Amino acid sequence: MHGITDGTYRLVSEYDPKGDQPKAIMALTDGVLRGDRWQTLLGVTGSGKTFTVSNVIAQVDKPVLVMSHNKTLAAQLYGELRQFFPDNAVEYFVSYYDFYQPEAYLPALDKYIAKDLRINDEIERLRLKTTSSLLSGRRDVIVVSSVSCIYGLGSPDDWKAQIVELRSGMEKDRDLFLQELVSLHYIRDDVDPGPGKFRVRGDIIDLVPAHEELALRVEFFGSEIESLQTFNIQSGELLGKDTYAFIYPARQFIAEAETLKQAMVAIENELAGRLNELRRDDRLVEARRLEERTRYDLEMMKELGYCSGIENYSRHLAGRSEGERPYCLLDYFPEDFLVIVDESHVTLPQIRGMYGGDRSRKAILVEHGFRLPSALDNRPLRFEEFTEIVPQVICVSATPGDLELERCGGVVVEQLVRPTGLLDPPVEVRPVKGQIDDLLAEIRRHTAKGHKALVMTLTKRMSEDLDDYFKKVGIRSRYLHSEIKSLERIQILRELRAGDVEVLVGVNLLREGLDLPEVSLVAILDADKEGFLRNTRSLMQIAGRAARNVDGFVVFYADVLTRSIMEVLDETARRRTVQQLYNETHGITPRSIRKSLDQVLNTTSVADAEERYRRKRFGLGAKSGVQSAALLHSFTPEESYAMVAELRLEMNEAAIQMEYEKAAYLRDEIARLMHGLEAQSDSKE
């Protein structure tokens, strides 16, 4: 809302860089200032990579985009960076859908699934705040984003052209200003104004900018703006006077009237051509369907300047050619911005895979007359387009992938020393013969100290059998498999930490950020069977799960020293040497990370909701006809929203996998649960 001048970063922290951090900060900063396009920070778990990156940001003084591969990690990074940079613009840009069922068509069943969604108003506000900050002209902007940043947005030039500048004392016609607000997609609401709305009381116009929480009061005297005041829309408390303010659009897709008119002509022309094709091929059903849908959208654009799904016409709105890449958040940055890719070994492949999945779904819609072919150009960036746009990139990972190593020429900046002084756990290779008896002895040795163990097998069947065997010989074990969802997984980890479980067994226990300080033993059976879960990167990741305990130990059961095993042994030995030397030089004694049982219970309490929900929903509750919403009365509000969030994650995953019927079922389940939550809230009021 307020005009903002250029700023510089001010890093706030009670800690100073130490260990490998000063060296890494200097190397990365020099690389950015030197103009290096790609750099990679190899930082072991717990070495303070976010703090290192924050120091680099503060020194290079560029607008920054921080990319993460999921919303949860993005939210964590957003929170950390806001603490490090409280005086700068740290923004959050992720998908604003609480749930999202994409438009789809199943030809085999002749079933159309309409797009359905629930937009999170707060995240939408934060997204608008992001674009507003980037176009405000300030340089001290850090945007934390998921891969949503590579999906299509409106033209930044069109968006910027619509910004309305207000100054106290300027000549401004009141009615013209109201028309400008409507053209920016602000809605008049004289009863309950909120973000993106305004109310009119004579010569006083109150509005809440779409990206702000505070309101702006514009007082007119004739055709002049007499005053601008910021106030709290809820309490009415005046917070201060302003000399000037900027009003930004309330939507991300926006076009000037002339641009919209030209786009509608282009849409009409494309529709006519496509209808001729369909009718020529005697596909009359598809032709009728396409004509009805498109003409309805055109009518909405004519009357309102907007329509549901307007992003599918973004090629015409932006005046782009067929196949030309769409505008996205990256286009809102100045030319010299810096990109930081967190967990790059996961995030970069995710970016590479976005285009194909999106195209395959939309191609079916186009083929069967639900969308014009131009909808295919409302898409995420191709990986090649992404790499062309970004001027400078720092990849951050404990195990950098081939994509980033290739672009960095194999040169990485290392950060191997942890602030706690903990060393990478030693790795030992033992023969396969007698591996179960040997493993059992190791487990008992570690659990006798109160520690826990992770065991990775080659197949699901082997994991189940081993879990059964451990139970028979008195080991408290649990089998963790791929079908277990997030909250249930948290419940199992809670049992592990609380002492109810001593051993976790599974095929793939590889989870970035799996924080288990109680684990001192990691065992990998059949480690010499090369494959995705036995390659160098995977073996290093899973071995790192024992790196939070001073007694950490890793054992590979293998008869053949594969290339992957040898690389892990060599890399572990190298890291331990560096870490040991640093500890000896600085008199540091390694200590395990400690967490109290109260901390464990507090961080995993939402798992109780999952257990009660599943027991009631699919047990007694289901038999007695109790609806989902009614079950929420036994949950705390925090547990209820955690349950809804978990189901949304499952629904989004189903949609990505094109399991549309499952996603639709979960969508309906979420709607019932949300209805119950709203009913609870109303009853309390």
UniProtKB/Swiss-Prot annotation:
Residues 641-676 form the UVR domain. It is found in: Cytoplasm. Residues 435-597 form the Helicase C-terminal domain. A motif (Beta-hairpin) lies at residues 96-119. ATP binds at residues 43-50. One of its GO terms (cellular component) is excinuclease repair complex. Residues 30-188 form the Helicase ATP-binding domain. InterPro entries: Helicase/UvrB_N, Helicase_ATP-bd, Helicase_C-like, P-loop_NTPase, UVR_dom, UVR_dom_sf, UvrB, UvrB_inter. One of its GO terms (molecular function) is excinuclease ABC activity. The keyword Oxidoreductase does not apply. The keyword Hydrolase applies. Keywords: ATP-binding, Cytoplasm, DNA damage, DNA excision, DNA repair, Excision nuclease, Helicase, Hydrolase, Nucleotide-binding, SOS response. SMART domains: DEXDc, HELICc. GO terms for biological process: nucleotide-excision repair; SOS response. Forms a heterotetramer with UvrA during the search for lesions. Interacts with UvrC in an incision complex. The UvrABC repair system catalyzes the recognition and processing of DNA lesions. A damage recognition complex composed of 2 UvrA and 2 UvrB subunits scans DNA for abnormalities. Upon binding of the UvrA(2)B(2) complex to a putative damaged site, the DNA wraps around one UvrB monomer. DNA wrap is dependent on ATP binding by UvrB and probably causes local melting of the DNA helix, facilitating insertion of UvrB beta-hairpin between the DNA strands. Then UvrB probes one DNA strand for the presence of a lesion. The beta-hairpin motif is involved in DNA binding. Belongs to the UvrB family. HAMAP family: UvrB (MF_00204). This is UvrABC system protein B. The gene is uvrB.
